[in-house]
Structures are given as structure tokens and as C-alpha cells.
Design a protein with these regions (language model features):
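Short aromatic/hydrophobic "clamp" motif used to bind/position activated sugar donors
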Residues: 167
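Short, flexible, basic/aromatic active-site loop/helix in glycosyltransferases
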Residues: 215-229
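Active-site-proximal specificity loops/subdomain of glycosyltransferases
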Residues: 114-115, 119-160
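A glycosyltransferase accessory/donor-loop signature
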Residues: 3-6, 10-81, 87, 98, ...
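Conserved donor-nucleotide/metal-binding helix-loop-beta segment in metal-dependent transferases, i.e.
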Residues: 178-212
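The conserved acidic donor/metal-binding loop of glycosyltransferases
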Residues: 171-175
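Short, acidic, metal-binding catalytic loop of nucleotide-sugar glycosyltransferases
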Residues: 91-99
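Short, charged, surface-exposed secondary-structure boundary motifs
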Residues: 134-140, 199-206, 305-306, 321-324
Length: 365
């Protein structure tokens, strides 16, 4: 392709994108929202704190830049979540236009080709050793490598690896659709607080739970005292932290001791009997119980209130890149597909390779 051909190619790709993903009014509306044209005026649902002026989310650090602030994602256990990490980086760079540094952590199981692809999106790709605890709380026959290795996320606290004032961790299955840079202004550590829905098949769902964005989380909310008395906890899919090498080393030492010495005294509300199911998440809940700051749930939305959401999270179940066949059937899926197409405009070979190798599929395998 010549330089003269490139604008036409981009224009054609943009037209295909619009044709494919603007078939429904809701999708067009959400697409406009990505450009900042959607007003938060027609709230439906209970995700938004009615006492919070959404203009607060426009406040960002005066010194925001790649030297002091960073976003990070994590890819471990092979390359199954590579499309998610690629889209997180693409969305942060080209949809919400952050000027913070982008760093992706990978372990040694991630192939060099995947690392190279990430290196074209992120400012830095860092290979980190996998971290595992002395015990996870799972029955051994139910323990999957995906959850066993999630303590690897603790590397984001390592100031030697992250020499920044603040680092924002974004899960590979969390899609930023509006700017997250405001989170760097919050006291660290910060996370969305979850609470129990006894009618749900899962223990935790997002609610405000009486805490306010940017305010300290009452430690009692994070206390779990028995099998029947489960209050709430943090969601580890979006974390804003201040790296601290000494604290990081202390955490590493702690997870090498039996969980009975430091873990909570409950079993999660799962029929399977899983105890401490999201291990690193609950470890951090205990570690910083007196220190957490609340993040508004719209930054880590369960895709229930899309017009007000800043981030969409596919927590449990099928991931968007595993079932992308007809994006127009779902607004949230269409938004993820739009981010994938944005990545394609910049790096078509990366998308083509992932699709050819079955990492991005039209339907579940």
C-alpha cells in the first residue's frame, strides 16, 4: 500500500465499521458517547450515585503523564486472553486518549509473538514470575490455573517494576469506554466495592453499598465473620494503587504462609463450596482493609447501565472475543467489537493473526 492509498483504506475501513456497528439506535447512541456527546441525563437503574456530580470525573492530575502514572494489564497462562489485553491497550490509547504510560505484564508462558504484538500497543511489556500462594482456599480438584496464578497481579505493587506515583490495573476483560484518568486523583488503594445479592447465583454484585466515590470505605463493610454473614468486598478487576516495594515484599512473604494465618473466616456463597474463590482479590481486601477508597461502580460496570458506564466488565462466563459473531445483538458486545476494529485500523496484521489462530471467534468452540 502506498502513502496515497492509506487515507482511502482508512476511510473505507471506517465506513465498514459504521455500516457494521450502527444498525441499532442504542449502538449509535453509545458510539456517540465514546466521543463525549452522550449526556448523563436519563438514568435508568441503580448504578449511579444520585448525589455525585459526574463532572467530578473530568478532574485529572495536573502532572498527568507517562513519567508519573501508568495503566497495566496482565496476561498469564498462555495467550487465551491476548485479545482482551490488546483491546484494553487500544481502548486506552485510541478511544479515551490517555497520556499515562501503558504497561502489560506477562509471564513466561506467553509466546514471543504475543509479547511482540503487545509491544506495539503498550509502551512496555514486562515479563514477571508467576506468584502462587501457600494455599488458595480451593478444593484441590476444583483449582484452575487461571485462579491459582492470579496472585501474579501483586507485581503491580512493586515500585521497582512500576516506578510511578499511581498505577491503575485493568483486567483483560474490562473495556474502558470513557476516560479513567480521574482515578489517578484518588487516595490509594482504590477499588469498586461489591455487595451480596442473596437472590443471585453468584455471591457478589455491584451496588453502592453506602459508600461514596473517592471516600474511605468503612472497614466493617469489608469484614467477613462467618459462613452466613458475608457483607461485601472489593472487585479486583479495576485497582488503583501506589507502588511500594517494602509493602510488596511483605505481601509476598505473607502469601507463603498458610491461609489460616491471614485469610478471612468465611466460605463464599457458592454451591460448589469454594472458599476464598477469587484469591488475590480477597487477599488484597484483607491486606488493605483499613485503607480502601471507593471507586464509583460505573468505572467497572457489569454492563447493566451502559449510558452511564465508563468501563464494561465481563466477569464470569464467556468473554467477548470468544463469541463475536453478531455484535449488533448486544450493545456491550458491539462496543468491544468497535475497539477491536479500532485496533485493526492501526494494526490489521495483529487482528488477522489472532483471528486466524482462533483467539477471536465468531462463536464458542
Amino acid at each position: 500500500m502506498t502513502d496515497a492509498d492509506e487515507p482511502n483504506a482508512v476511510d473505507s475501513a471506517a465506513k465498514r465499521l459504521l455500516t457494521r456497528f450502527t444498525e441499532q439506535t442504542a449502538i449509535r447512541r453509545l458510539a456517540r458517547g465514546l466521543a463525549g456527546e452522550l449526556l448523563l441525563a436519563d438514568h435508568e437503574g441503580d448504578i449511579v450515585d444520585p448525589n455525585l456530580d459526574p463532572r467530578v470525573f473530568t478532574r485529572v492530575p495536573a502532572d498527568l503523564g507517562p513519567d508519573r502514572y501508568a495503566y497495566t494489564a496482565l496476561l498469564i497462562g498462555g495467550e487465551g486472553y491476548l485479545p482482551g489485553c490488546l483491546v484494553v491497550g487500544a481502548a486506552l490509547r485510541w478511544h479515551v486518549h490517555t497520556c499515562a504510560a501503558l504497561v502489560c505484564m506477562v509471564d513466561d508462558s506467553v509466546p514471543q509473538g504475543a509479547r511482540d504484538a503487545l509491544g506495539r500497543i503498550y509502551d512496555r511489556v514486562s515479563v514477571v514470575p508467576r506468584l502462587r500462594a501457600h494455599d488458595s482456599g480451593y478444593p484441590t480438584d476444583m483449582l484452575s490455573d487461571a485462579y491459582r496464578d492470579m496472585y501474579t497481579k501483586l507485581h503491580l505493587f512493586d515500585a521497582a517494576l512500576f516506578p510511578y506515583e499511581r498505577v491503575c490495573f485493568v483486567d483483560a476483560d474490562l473495556l474502558p469506554i470513557r476516560c479513567f484518568d480521574h482515578l489517578f486523583t484518588l487516595p490509594a488503594p482504590a477499588a469498586v466495592i461489591e455487595s451480596v445479592d442473596p437472590t443471585s447465583q453468584y455471591a457478589y454484585v455491584h451496588h453502592m453499598h453506602g459508600v461514596r466515590h473517592g471516600k474511605p470505605v468503612p472497614p466493617a463493610i469489608l469484614e467477613v465473620t462467618s459462613d452466613e454473614d458475608v457483607t461485601g468486598g472489593i472487585n479486583g478487576g479495576l485497582l488503583m494503587v501506589a507502588p511500594d516495594r517494602a509493602r510488596f515484599e511483605d505481601m509476598l512473604a505473607r502469601i507463603q504462609r498458610p491461609m489460616s494465618e491471614w485469610g478471612p473466616r468465611h466460605r463464599q456463597l457458592y454451591d460448589s463450596g469454594i472458599r476464598y474463590g477469587f484469591a488475590e482479590q480477597h487477599f488484597l481486601q484483607v491486606e488493605f482493609q483499613q485503607e480502601w477508597t471507593a471507586i464509583d461502580p460505573r468505572f467497572n460496570s457489569m454492563r447493566t447501565d451502559l449510558p452511564h458506564s465508563f468501563g464494561l466488565h465481563w466477569t464470569i462466563g464467556r468473554k467477548p472475543w470468544q463469541n463475536l459473531g453478531n455484535p449488533a445483538r448486544s450493545v456491550s458486545l458491539a462496543l468491544w467489537a468497535m475497539a477491536w476494529e479500532t485496533l485493526r485500523l492501526h494494526h490489521p496484521d495483529i487482528c488477522a493473526d489472532a483471528e486466524q489462530r482462533g483467539l477471536v471467534r465468531d462463536k464458542p468452540s
